[in-house]
């Protein structure tokens, strides 16, 4: 009969199970706090009442029932020495009882938390995204921190596009040399050129930039022109030097990923080139060339030196025909002699003297 009734019982849903577990956890936490309060209360009352009783009995005995003989005095004072020890043992016993209750309560609390964690893991695996998100936000204590983390702005990694618009950033503006500020009063008019046209001030390029760009900006700075007219020379070349290495795009296809896996290339196999002055991203270099690569920042034009000097291979000896002939001619050996040298060096015969006479 019980088996039949149990079949008709509806199984609790995940939300109901978590609600029951939360209720039990709340009750156990309240019981733990209540148990700690009771322990302090009972131990405090024990010490207070025992101390007050000890003082009252001591005064009462001393004033009314103190005998004159020393042996009787020692016998009557003996309970006053045993009483503090007895109170100390009672205090230890109370602390032991309350600590045991706290341990049992903590064990149940840990079991319930483990069960709750297991159910939440099953929810993340089995439930849909919408239901799982709602359950986690309701029952997971760490879910309150997730909106705060999502609300914090994350600086996206920017990739250079056509025309290199990314180089006109606030970093370059931060490092631009600023001239002396000119106080602008309301109603003041901009300076006029020779033809009566207003002159616009064009900011100079960043320090360390190409010299031709600085000269161009200086020449254009005080050139009289009308408002809205194009600046000569601007737009003819990109704002700064090109990136040292390209930045790999984020949205790569499956074919690109397969090729990167086969070749051994990709973002995980490259190192970012970060400027030491403005901390800007200047592309990604290969592992082999990262420590030996020197580059100029595309934003502040700072020259970043290489971390290491590239080792140079030993020079190979030169084997050519002329050097070989020179080496053979310089080696000592029997030199070929001519016929005249042979005749002059031959010794004179016995029948001839030094002057050729017989």
Swiss-Prot record:
One CC-aspect GO term: endoplasmic reticulum tubular network membrane
Pfam families linked to this entry: Zn_ribbon_10
Coiled coil regions, renumbered to chain: 9-41, 99-128
Location(s) in or outside the cell: Endoplasmic reticulum membrane
TM helices/strands, residue ranges: 46-66, 70-90
Lumenal side: 67-69
Entry keyword set: Coiled coil, Endoplasmic reticulum, Membrane, Metal-binding, Transmembrane, Transmembrane helix, Zinc, Zinc-finger
GO biological process: endoplasmic reticulum tubular network maintenance; positive regulation of endoplasmic reticulum tubular network organization
C4-type zinc finger span: 275-300
Protein origin, superkingdom: Eukaryota
Modification after translation (UniProt): Phosphorylated. Phosphorylation occurs during interphase. Phosphorylation also occurs during mitosis; these phosphorylations reduce both its homodimerization and the ER three-way tubular junction formation.
Topological domain ranges for the Cytoplasmic compartment: 1-45, 91-358
Free-text comment on this protein's domains from its UniProt entry: The transmembrane domain 1 and 2 function as a signal-anchor and stop-transfer sequence, respectively, generating a double-spanning integral membrane protein with a N- and C-terminal cytoplasmic orientation. Transmembrane domain 1 and 2 are probably sufficient to mediate membrane translocation and topology formation in a N-myristoylation-independent manner. Transmembrane domain 2 is sufficient to block the protein secretion pathway. The two coiled-coil domains are necessary for its endoplasmic reticulum (ER) three-way tubular junction localization.
Function statement: Endoplasmic reticulum (ER)-shaping membrane protein that plays a role in determining ER morphology. Involved in the stabilization of nascent three-way ER tubular junctions within the ER network. May also play a role as a curvature-stabilizing protein within three-way ER tubular junction network.
Record text on subunit structure and interactions: Homodimer; homodimerization requires the C4-type zinc finger motif and decreases during mitosis in a phosphorylation-dependent manner.
Protein name: Endoplasmic reticulum junction formation protein lunapark-B
Organism: Takifugu rubripes (Japanese pufferfish)
